[in-house]
Amino acid sequence: MRKNLHSNIVKSIIGIALLAFLSSCNSDPLGTTEPPVDTYNPIEYSPGSADFSNYVAIGNSLTAGFVDGALYNLGQQKSIPALLAGQLRAAGGQAVFNQPSVNSDYGCSNPGSGCTLGKYKLDADIPGPSPTLLGDPITAYAGDKTALHNFGVPGIQVGQLLTPETGIPGAAAFNPYYARFASSPGTSTILGDVLSRNPSFFTLWIGNNDVLGYATSGATNEAIFTDPAAFRARFEIVVGQLMGQTDAEGIVVDIPPILYAPYFQAVPYNPVVFDPESDADMGLVSLLNANFSGFNAALAGLQGIGQLTAADVEERKIQYTAGPNPVLIQDLNLEDLSSKFDVLATFGAITDEQRAALQPYVQARPIKQGEIITLPAGGVIGTLADPNNPTSVLGVALPLPAQFALAAADIQRIEQRRGELNAIIADVAGDYSSRIAFYNTNDPNGTFADLFGIDGSAPGIEFGGQFLNADFSPFGLFSTDGIHPNPRGAAIVANEMLDLIESSFSATLPRVNVLSLPTVALCTGQGAASDCASRVAGL
């Protein structure tokens, strides 16, 4: 059963068609080239009313160039601000866009465990995205900290732009990616360092992590789910200081529809598949249903004494069938049935042994279509909670822990909070509309709606005659972490910003050639460095 489950999850995450099509780590499977330049009718680029001579970028991982679960050379070189700065250069932008380079081809995907692992990759021999075995430590930036233009710091929330604690090891707000380039670790702030550069133009994309961290935790970490009132106070300070202490103009970006990213979409709700033609699988179905008959009977008993409704019982009942089945999850939104099961034991309806066996299921139910299994769950479903107990299969015999799923109530809370924070971002940006252009990533007719199929179309977008997917395949726009765009996705966002700059500041600017940039590579050989480095080569 475990092999069958894992096999089906692999199919959903990587895509069998891609494995058949690609035989090596080709960084550009589409075979695209730069478009020809019209040398007879050259375009005259212009900044319009804007001044791009000192462009700085402020934000989180999306600004820093964090891709594939790590901050490494390729992601920084092809970050959204770097691509944007390259085009602004044609209209008076600075000749060099300085970023706090990590000087690493692999980066670090497990900073809490000593950086033993690097960026994530797709490997034909390993189910789903997996890290390289070559992680590099996060070291201090060796360049000139006073000359930086990219102030993107992976993982930060809006409040971390304002506190010196972001650079203090051991502090609640500490972030090693800021500490490495802070002008004065322990006393400086990210925003203070930005203001010291006296920018003439800026991009500000902050707020994602004020919602995203809660979502990736399976709605289990309330402490990182920023309250709207606190968010407004902090965001107003950030924008107010940019407006009050500089003459800069710029772009403010809101929080995109994060739950449509592949991190929340790649693993289906029903990957537990039993083959109706397999006697072994059908035997497992019978065994599972026999084992859960006692749990289902206990639910019926609680209904019989008025402790549960018929709808409660139907929602929690566990029954497996041939074909695809939903994952069994822990849902912390459900009433904990511990005390009610205790009542059954007290009155002799169940034995003490039966009562103990019910404990793992006091907040368990099969997940429903439309609810979310997160990407990390793909490596957990079908594994054993207890290696010494072959019946402890997570997501099947035991509920998948809450941090790997989002129930409907969780999704509703996340979307409501995202909407509240986006309203604040739009409101504050609107207060300075003469100097700030607002990039609404939630425009129902915009690129994000098109990419994710929110507008009713099929997910994905057509660009330059090629169809690009909302996934982390070699034909996708996301990196292998399922959250951050790959270089092609970054280029599309940069071009969206260029469109906005033109319309808001009467500029005329070139665009990034999306299809000339590398995409996700399919690696072989257990992630050998020589294979997985191919995407970097030749840039």
Segments the model singles out, each with a brief description of its role:
Residues R2, L19-D51, A507-T524:
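Bacterial Sec-dependent N-terminal signal peptides
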Residues L71-I237, L259, F264, G348, ...:
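Conserved SGNH/GDSL esterase-like catalytic core that processes O-acyl groups on lipids
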Residues Q265-Q416, A426-I483:
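Mobile gating loops/cap/lid regions near enzyme active sites that modulate substrate access
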Residues S53-G69:
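Catalytic nucleophile-elbow at a beta strand-turn-alpha helix junction centered on a G-D-S/GDSL motif
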Residues S196-R197, R234-V252, R417-N440:
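A structural motif corresponding to the C-terminal end of an alpha-helix
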